[in-house]
Amino acid sequence: MAEMEKEGRPPENKRSRKPAHPVKREINEEMKNFAENTMNELLGWYGYDKVELKDGEDIEFRNYSADGESRQHISVLKENSLPKPKLPEDSVISPYNINTSYPGLATGNGLSDSPAGSKDHGNVPIIVPLIPPPFIKPPAEDDVSNVQIMCAWCQKVGIKRYSLSMGSEVKCFCSEKCFAACRRAYFKRNKARDEDGHAENFPQQHYAKETPRLAFKNNCELLVCDWCKHIRHTKEYLDFGDGERRLQFCSAKCLNQYKMDIFYKETQANLPAGLCSTLHPPVENKAEGTGVQLLTPDSWNIPLADARRKAPSPASAAGQIQGPGPSASTTASPSDTANCSVTKIPTPVPKPIPISENPNIPPVSVQPPASIVPPIGVPPRSPPMVMTNRGPVPLPIFMEQQIMQQIRPPFIRGPPHHASNPNSPLSNPMIPGIGPPPGGPRNMGPTSSPMHRPMLSPHIHPPTTPTMPGNPPGLLPPPPPGAPLPSLPFPPVSMMPNGPMPMPQMMNFGLPSLAPLVPPPTLLVPYPVIVPLPVPIPIPIPIPHINDSKPPSGFSSNGENFIPSNSSETPGGKPPNSSSSPRESKQGSSKPSDSSPSCSGQSLNQAQVLQEHSKNEVVDLTVRPSSPVNSKFGFPSVLQGPQDGVIDLTVGHRSRLHNVIHRALHAQVKVEREPNSVVNLAFGSSDKRNCSDCRDNCSPVDSKTLPCGDAAHCCPVSLASGTPGLEAGAAVCNVIVNGTKSTEGSKNPEPPQDPKKPQPPEELAVSELESVKENNCASNCHLEGDTGKKAGEEPLAGGDKQDPNLNNPADEDHAYALRMLPKTGCVIQPVPKPAEKTAIAPCIMSTPILSTGPEDLEPPLKRRCLRIRNQNK
């Protein structure tokens, strides 16, 4: 045995070939009996019939692998093609000829050695690993063994290499692989049917063929899934069928897929060709009723008969009301798939009346009074039906159609009133959306035939339409004829021409017809629906109220409306008067305070009162910059006093200034006369106000002069008449503030003050007043020249007083100032901030400048103010 095994186990690379010297040893009876018993026992383990070697001489047993899982097999081979005539034993023993030493023996040659050699070969069963190659070259002498057979497993034609007795028949295999696979399948079928074990071991491509060809004892029980075509060796096959044929599926998944497939095929075969048109309204025939019921999720759960009755084709739907019989009768017998909830879909119901031919067809009017009443034959459980001119349509389907229509421009939705006109081109189904609004019948109520009514345009409808009982409770009543339709891009119906102009179905908004069911955004349905079209909703946008008090005066064409012009511009001609003048133009009440320089005291008092109110305004911040600016302007003594005063009183002073500025804001002349002018560049009269404030702080008279100085801001003359140096400084400030003032831009002495003056917010309002008071600037310039002188001395005190004068006229402007600067110490107005600071600085500088000659060049100052203001514009 050892020698035999030694020789019988050729190297791995030689296993596929017949060994050069096969083992030739005679097997004694004991070994033969042992082999037979062992083989039978193994076969019994795997459910095979017992093999009698003597009886099975004619059967070629080859390489029966005992263990289906392992590669160690007991090769039971018989030299079938060459039965040993010498010794019956040999023939009996021959099955045990250990040709398995080369497991890949050609099927036919149990012992491909010489026939006589079978006995000499030492026929001894040997356990060898059987890993046969796909093809085993048969021995040359075994010509008979080269029998071409069709492998019982892989169904390929090949040389017979293995054969297996299946009791009544013998299976031939082309290779040991096929033999093992077949044996394993047989074993699993008989012994492990409850396991889904090794189905993967079967060549998937052969499953369909295996069933008929694998003639195992229980082969009849081997089932192929009718859906996935796989052999599942389990007991869980699901039977399905109506009795004529039983389909078997390996799993519920396959069964469901099969049912879906059957249902799909049946519906495809039975659905009218127009079914697709419902999804695509552009189809011309859609109006003709070709829009058959869509298969919606509800359709799957509703018996086909019910579904059919529920949603006949739109055209037939119209007829359905007349004679629901056709649609109901068309219910098809259930499909073969008993489990399919939907049976074959009946052929489309005959279209009694193509709506395209006559959209107003009376049959529709014959329909029940309202869609509220379900069409005859529609089961109560069916989804709500929408009565359209094409007939009752399930709401889900109708919604889909509406969505498709919404996709189209609303114009082609089909004008309602023209749709009513059979001859109306709009009713022509060329544009699916156009035509009698499908919603018309839907709204139909006890009122006159809804078909005609929906056709009417909203304005054509009597005003009672909104409350028509025909409107289903879920539908919105049509809006009043004149009321703009919600979310409609079109004007109210009343605005629409009554002529044949096609009105988008949306115009049928509230009409019982609900045209294409109301503008899509307003479509009312019993269940939530995604609205495809955005509805424009007016959103109130708060508008800055900076200019609310006196937008006309506050806003100057120069764009200084955001820059409050200091009232100083106005005071330029007449410090009190100027402020009152702009203010008078805005409010006559302030006029007395501004009437004359003598009123400046009153104005200052009023301004002080207002100052407290406007301290929270831009004026406060503006004043603060003013004091630093004043120091920069080179008026340290006068300006420093005012600065401190301005800083402390600035709030009040600034408030007054703001009031003055707001008063003068309309006459906003962003002139670069002085440092005040610089301020004015950004803030117009506000800058002047600042200057006036500084001057006012110096002295009441100076304060008046300061307005004149402010006027100088307005008018370059004031600056010129004023101290040239200061005037130049003011010009610089103006340049800095406005950046557009070429005249004062050339004067760079005070550009730094512009950055200092971030109080443009206050001066925005001032500039507004200034623009109004610009004309007063010239007259005020002289007064402000005087006040400017005093302002240099008493910028804070005089300025505050002067500012009250300004504030009184600027009370209206004061409102601007409050809006502009909520806090006295904070400059809120963004634009005027830099300008106002500059304005304050110019005010400080302007005080001497204006005091020097604010009155000198009043007309020139005014002209210059106007010119600079135009430049700023």
UniProtKB/Swiss-Prot annotation:
Residues 312-338, 571-603 have a biased composition (Low complexity). Residues 554-570 have a biased composition (Polar residues). Keywords: Metal-binding, Repeat, Zinc, Zinc-finger. A zinc finger (FCS-type) spans 142-180, 216-256. Residues 1-26, 307-338, 413-485, 550-608, 742-766, 779-811 are annotated as: Disordered. One of its GO terms (cellular component) is nucleus. It holds the Pfam family SOBP. One of its GO terms (biological process) is inner ear morphogenesis. Residues 460-485 have a biased composition (Pro residues). Belongs to the SOBP family. Implicated in development of the cochlea. This is Sine oculis-binding protein homolog. It comes from Gallus gallus (Chicken).
